[in-house]
Amino acid sequence: MFIATSCSNGSSSKDYQEESDFSQTASGKNDSNGFVYIKGGTVSKRVGKEGCPFYNASETPVTIESFYIAETETTYKKWLEVYEWATSDERGEEKYTLNKGYQGNYEDKNYGTPLMPVTFLSWRDAIVWCNAASEMDKLEPVYLISKTDNTPVRQAETSTVTSGFGKAENAYVDKSANGYRLPTEAEWEYAARGGNPYIESWNYDYSGINNIEELVDYAVCIVSNLKNKLTNTAEVKSKKPNYAGLYDMSGNVWEWCYDEYSSTERIFRGGGWIYPANFCTVDYRGYADNLKNSSDDAVKIIDLDQVYGKSSAVGFRVVRNANK
């Protein structure tokens, strides 16, 4: 099941124009591997409505540790490279099991391009792929069987099981590991807003722009589809980046976050190519029931697989801890 809820900005930009050590932040520094450094800090002004990560920041400041985030959504090219390595029979007992995904919004690989974001993958698939990518790059996997068993979770199950050690949704999260992982919802929104609460773009409606007339230059969504006659996902980096140098934080595909919305639902953010502009703001929250079946057709995302939360409009991008 897919639902989206608004967390619109509840603060004026002047609340953030004060002196701080965020001035001309280092956020936005790109490395050779396609990751952008996001300088951590403390958000102490309310932004967004109830339910958003920084809603209670005025009463309870929220501290974000520095982290690295991929400058683009995970492409099908990168997904497939890791998938083929991870699912090879040569890996024996350490072989991974996960969904192969779509090339953009196309199941048929004769359409689209490998530089479109991978789609049609569940939250479980994303978690397991992160572990596979970490192992392939000789990094420390983040999602483990348990606190006492450091075996990486390698199975993205296609059952409705929601309990038991070693399941993707019940993995032990090694917060000290240096491998790839999904961003928390707070990390995602912090980066989407530009990685600095004291810059003007922190309060923009969209990632990188505040003017819907210019949104076509920053986001792949219904507004840009109508203007550019697009009928599908776009290659990453087709639009302009936000203040931090991140592409497609608004539009193209929704991006899985690690956080739970409920015990059976996980959050994704950013909006997608088949959605109107108001779904692609930095404060819209989507969530999907990827762990159990649902018969509520009224809120069903277009072509969403109700059991596994998969859609041609949902993908992800990865982050890594900094200073690890």
Predicted segments, located by residue:
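Bacterial Sec-dependent N-terminal signal peptides
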Residues: 2-34
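GGW-centered surface loops in extracellular recognition modules
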Residues: 21-39, 44, 171-172, 177-180
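Short, polar loop/linker segments at the starts of domains and inter-domain junctions
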Residues: 45-66, 230-238, 278-304
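Active-site microenvironments of metalloenzymes and redox enzymes
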Residues: 50-51, 63-209, 262, 320-324
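Short, well-ordered junction/capping motifs at the entry into regular secondary structure
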Residues: 166-175, 216-250
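Chymotrypsin/trypsin-fold serine protease catalytic domain
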Residues: 197-234, 265-270
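Disulfide-stabilized, aromatic/cysteine-rich ligand-recognition loop
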Residues: 240-242, 261-324
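Active-site-proximal beta-strands of protease catalytic cores
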Residues: 251-259
